[in-house]
């Protein structure tokens, strides 16, 4: 999410730098984005008119606001703290981390953002400062392949993501060839796990 009322996201004329917000956490939406059937969408007109009801979830300590400012703060709040691209506008997706198909919703977010950027005729860099220890981490799962395809579909598209911030807590297993070996992994946090299998046909077992 994002605190779109922060001065660093408002230009010199008093208009928002946030072009769109898609809040995927809204359970009973009244305005879902085109091509998607969940979450609530607002545009810059809604924000400027004061009818956007999106709230940056306090449970995530303003994380979305922080990373948005690092990317595109115009420095209005203090005239000293600027983002990497202070003249850039923002398209924000508030992720639902409790979704049963969280990675799928991330791929939806990528499609949504690139589509909106295309409609404005602008290049686009997507920042995903989030991650998971689940999955293969080899870029071959369906959601990763979908994101890769979206990114490569047109020029002027880029995507950056967090490389991990677990520090010395190695809560993941590094993959290697098991064709002639046995792997034993102890999972610290759960008494049971579900391991999906991906067939070449695309089926998930």
PLM features: residue spans?
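Substrate-binding/access-modulating region of protease and related hydrolase catalytic domains
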Residues: 5, 96-204
